[in-house]
Amino acid sequence: MNNNENQNKKINQAVILAGGIGTRLKPYTDTMPKPLYPINNIPFIDYLIHQIKSFEIYNVLILLGYLPEKITNYLGDGSRHGVNITYDIAPLNYETGARLKHAISKIYDKFLLLYCDNYCPIDYSKLLNDFCNNNSKIQITAYSNRDNYTKSNLKLEKDGRVAKYDKRREEANLYGVDIGYALVDKSVVLSIPEKNCNFESEVYPQLVKKGEIFATITEHRYYSVGSFERIQLTEEFFKTKKVVFLDRDGTINKRPLKACYVERPEEFEWLPGAIEAIKLLKKNGFLIFIITNQPGVARGNLTKEILYSIHQKMHNELLEEGVDVDDIFYCPHNWNEGCFCRKPNPGMLFEAQKKYSLDLSKSYFIGDDERDIEAGMKGGCKCRMVDRENTILDIVKEIVALEK
């Protein structure tokens, strides 16, 4: 892609909807606006501004209504955060559609629209590519909601086109949740009627009819300050964690011959440097998770009980060295079962992500096979491959140095 094409794709403004009262956060919001709710002693909006900056977007327009001076006094012109922040203050009773319409003169031709209470480490480059390739008026980000984390409000076609948007979340067979992070063409804002209306309820159904709204799906759980029920998970997510995922066979232990498996504990044999690598990670405060395909379970070569005993041997030998891994995730399915967990699918990574409130975009995946790397990339991890030139210990030393 040449520089002109890159420039044409670049989005230069983020718009944050931040005008609501935040009723579900009372009594905090009796005196403070929701975006300033402290998560680990940092106002939530700081995390959003930092993320926007990581997308190389440096112009931020914040749409305010409730206690606007609290936010303007705190953020100022944005220079402290390395961005340029401007504001549009509309009447308190304005809904999101009217709030966007009120700010029309300040909105760029194309912009990133965010909710002030949601955070997700999205793949922004994919979102942007989808927006351009689909020629959509709006490209929203949708959480897949495989785990029924909340009620879905979308129905999607296979190509990502939004077939139904249900603000009330009442219809059957919905799949996916709109979490914001929408790339928007300004023409959509111009089409908002001159009345006090909700942006999504008013505009999305019209775009659905025209086939002009698409979704980029993320499997990564999103985090929120929308209600107190979500706060604890959000606080856990934003705690600093250093994380490494390790493949098993061929990465930390000797790989069996093709189509063969480690079928007994005595067949599990550590690769040179693997235990030392795990000790080095633990010494430097990393969480360590094993991610392994074990189709031998489906094929009858070993039972789950035997697999457990193999992993127990691994645990015991690590404990003798004064360390251990934090958890093991395995896929017991055969290659043709169509599961989401078997690598190169990233299901085990997202299972770990949800269980431990991890940020996969800040995590590493080390494997010895292209399927490992593909799974890690689908999960948004930083990937490293063990090969003849790079042992697991070499790679771990590099990661430890990078994360100091």
PLM region spans:
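Asp-based, Mg2+/Mn2+-dependent phosphohydrolase catalytic module
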Residues: 305, 309-326, 334-365, 369-404
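Conserved beta-loop-beta/alpha segment of the NTase-like Rossmann-fold superfamily
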Residues: 72, 78-158
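Substrate-recognition element of Asp-dependent hydrolases with the DxDx(T/V) motif
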Residues: 63, 274, 278-314, 325-334, ...
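Catalytic-core segments of class I nucleotidyltransferases/pyrophosphorylases
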Residues: 111-112, 119, 125-132, 145-148, ...
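Metal-dependent phosphoesterase signature
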Residues: 36, 253-272, 297-302, 306, ...
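N-terminal glycine-rich phosphate-binding loop and ensuing alpha1 helix
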Residues: 7-71, 272
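Residue-level signal for inorganic ion chemistry
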Residues: 45, 71, 103, 117, ...
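Active-site neighborhood of HAD-like aspartate-dependent phosphohydrolases
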Residues: 242-287
